Swiss-Prot record:
Part of the ABC transporter complex OppABCDF involved in the uptake of oligopeptides. Plays an important nutritional role. Binds peptides containing from two to five amino acid residues. Keywords: Peptide transport, Periplasm, Protein transport, Signal, Transport. This is Periplasmic oligopeptide-binding protein OppA. It is found in: Periplasm. Residues 1-20 form the signal peptide. GO terms for molecular function: peptide transmembrane transporter activity. Belongs to the bacterial solute-binding protein 5 family. It comes from the Bacteria. The lineage of its organism: Bacteria, Pseudomonadati, Pseudomonadota, Gammaproteobacteria, Pasteurellales. Pfam families: SBP_bac_5 (PF00496). The keyword Protein transport applies. The complex is composed of two ATP-binding proteins (OppD and OppF), two transmembrane proteins (OppB and OppC) and a solute-binding protein (OppA). InterPro entries: Peptide/Ni-bd, SBP_5, SBP_5_CS, SBP_5_dom. GO terms for biological process: peptide transport; protein transport.
Length: 541
């Protein structure tokens, strides 16, 4: 992976050519250069410290640009920083910011803006869903600040001068640069946020440093962007304006696409239409294998899911192959582990032994566990599956509920509960659920982005899973001196999570979507499937 090329045993400044959309010579561009994309939901917020999902990151990456970013294939590229270096122990990282980078109000983008933003992220007063991210990266004092033991000003970041941003970590973190692409580490216009508080995200107040500006927002309908002429690389940008729609229903998404109302669907096509779409729209169906896991989170602190045998029974009696092959059938692969084994340094993670056992044997053991817990046909285990409103999630939930009932001979009785995106996120975070549909996509291509999720003190850990041995295994990954040592620690942590049955992993994601043939610059090869408008262009059609 690209980030291996970034690290040196000596302090070495690394520079990259500026990222830009590549338009082949002789290409006839469309005059309008406007694109309509379905974003899949109404975002929680335009504040990157108040969000945690894909609809939100899709918006954030247009309006704001971090230290580093990525190209259309997911390869690391310079962003607000034009170069960086690290000390031999991988514990001090120095980023040199572009002196021509400006906020959309004309102010320069400085190291002070990054210091302000990163401190705000870990400040308990912010209550950021991703507060733990800087703790994951081992930034000095991050966890103590989150826990209220130290002040945000004590975070291990500094503005050495206006254009030099320095990060100090307590342990070696050789993948620091890769992790800096994440939405939670985007800079904020410190003067604007300090003056306006939470109102800074309103359309009339929004100031960003990204390739686009916020032009309009109609809640639950659309978000409109316009090109930012003050963006440092605006001369290489082609798309002039864009509209993101908030269509949650995949069938409606496809219908609007076929009617010509949008140029790119959200990720996730209706399974029953997939083969037909491949046949009727050759070249327009993209299927991107991503670093993501679809699972059912179990509320580990809520009875009866605080009983490991109940969690085990649910894992045993769910046939993942039925969901991937018969319900979805778009290239998803069944999994019984949370961390994708194909992510960097995840290669030592093994699927559990029961994944290879016949379903009849697994079902028999699940029934025994449920009966021992006091359940029967007359007194079945009853719970609800919470999912965000989406017909594909509903199909998976119906299949899971049916399998759990049939495979345990009526010892499980499941109801379905759907909520719109923002309410669903709030319910999971507040622990108002039994079992919840969950999807986790890599924040960067390295196994810690999954392993850290289930740390006892993780702000992302909505399953409320906690095991000191798991925490210890993840700590060992930071103490490891090489990639193989880290890989062993990740495998150990995953094995502990598996023996605790803390979650029900179901499949590894693919992102199927439709893209009009006149939309260029989308490769379908980015393992995180980020959408950057600055990477796209429209040809004459």
């Amino acid at each position: 992976m690209q980030h291996k090329l970034l690290f040196s045993a000596i302090a070495l400044a690394l520079s990259y050519s500026a990222q830009a959309v590549i338009v082949p010579e002789g290409t006839q561009l469309d005059e309008k250069q406007h694109i309509v994309i379905n974003n899949g939901a109404e975002p929680q917020s335009f504040d990157p410290h108040k969000t945690e999902g894909v609809p939100e990151s899709n918006v954030a990456y247009q309006l704001l640009e971090g230290l580093v970013t990525s190209d259309s294939e997911g390869k690391l590229q310079p962003g607000a920083a034009e170069s960086w270096e690290n000390t031999p122990d991988f514990k001090t990282w120095t980023f040199h910011l572009r002196k021509d980078a400006k906020w959309s109000n004309g102010d320069p983008v400085t190291a002070h803006d990054f210091v302000f933003a990163w401190r705000r992220l870990v400040d308990p007063a912010t209550a950021a869903p991703y507060a733990s991210y800087l703790s994951y990266l081992q930034v000095e004092n991050a966890q103590d600040i989150i826990d209220g033991k130290k002040k945000p000003a004590e975070l291990g970041v500094e503005x050495k001068d206006d254009y030099t941003f320095v990060v100090h970590t307590t342990n070696p973190v050789p993948y620091t640069v890769s992790x800096x692409t994440h939405q939670s580490l985007l800079p904020l216009p410190x003067k604007v946020v300090e003056k306006l508080g939470d109102a800074w995200v309103k359309k009339e107040n929004y100031v960003g440093n990204g390739a686009y500006k916020l032009a309009n927002h109609i809640i639950n309908e659309k978000i409109e962007f316009e090109r930012n002429p003050l963006y440092w690389n605006d001369k290489e940008t082609v798309i002039n304006s864009a509209t993101f729609l908030a269509i949650e229903n995949p069938s409606t998404d496809v219908a609007r696409y076929r009617a010509g109302d949008l140029d790119m669907t959200s990720y996730g096509l209706p399974p029953e239409q997939f083969a037909k779409l491949q046949k009727e729209l050759p070249g327009e169906v993209y299927v991107t294998r991503t670093l993501g896991t679809y699972s059912y989170e179990l509320n580990n602190k809520k009875a009866p899911f605080d009983n490991v045998n109940i969690r085990k029974a649910l894992n045993l009696s769910l046939d993942r192959n039925v969901i991937t092959d018969k319900v979805l059938g778009q290239g998803q692969t069944p999994t019984y582990v949370f961390t994708p084994t194909y992510i960097e340094e995840g290669h030592l993670i093994q699927q559990p032994a029961y994944s290879k056992e016949p379903m009849a044997q697994r079902n028999e053991e699940a029934i025994k566990l449920l009966e021992e817990a006091g359940y029967s046909k007359a007194n079945p285990l009853k719970f609800s599956i919470l999912y965000n409103t989406n017909e594909n999630h509903k199909k998976v939930a119906i299949a899971a509920a049916s399998m759990w009932k049939a495979n345990t001979k009526g010892l499980i009785d499941v109801k379905l509960e759907n909520q719109e995106w923002k309410t669903y996120i709030d319910s999971r975070r507040a622990g108002r659920y039994d079992v919840a549909r969950a999807g986790w996509n890599a924040d960067y291509n390295q196994a810690t982005t999954f392993g850290n999720y289930f740390l006892s003190n993780s702000s992302n850990n909505t399953a409320k899973y906690a095991n000191p041995e798991y925490d210890k295994a993840m700590a060992e990954s930071y103490a490891a001196t090489d990639a193989e040592g880290r890989a062993k620690a990740y495998a150990k942590a995953e094995e502990i999570l598996g023996k605790d049955y803390g979650i029900v992993p179901i499949f590894n994601y693919v992102n199927p979507r439709l893209v009009k043939p006149y939309v260029k610059g989308y490769s379908g090869k980015d393992p995180q499937d980020h959408i950057y408008l600055r990477n796209l262009y429209i040809i004459k059609h």
